[in-house]
Amino acid sequence: MTEVYVDVAAASMEQGGAGAAVRPAEPEAVRALRYLADSGIRVVIVAAGIRPDAELEAVAAEVVDAVPARPRGPAWYITSDIARCRGASARLRTVLIGAAPPSGSVRRCDAVARDVQAAAMEILAAVAMPPTTDAGPT
């Protein structure tokens, strides 16, 4: 089963700074994550010290403090922090939400999306149409 890890900050509205006890979720992000869950993808919220609001937590199968060092199977990580793309497991595809990193950046994410909704569409497409390893008919 494919898992999608999502930072609370990536799925939240701009309000609710670092000192907020609960960061309010972006409604379109919640809708996109619910669509992933309804499609059979396991959605996991990565709290990292920021408590998700009830709506965001309700769409998740689990809330964890950090992404596991080695995911159990194919997995994606949606984050708004480019530093979290570095050092990720080869089994974990990272998607940066927001602006693309500056050219020449030493930190590399596997993909960049304007928002969680665009990231969800990319994930759904990749799950539905995985790359073929076959060179073709023989």
List PLM regions with ranges:
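Asp-based, Mg2+/Mn2+-dependent phosphohydrolase catalytic module
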Residues: 1-8, 14-41, 53-76, 80-138
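Conserved phosphate-coupling serine/threonine residues in phosphotransfer and NTP-handling enzymes
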Residues: 47-49
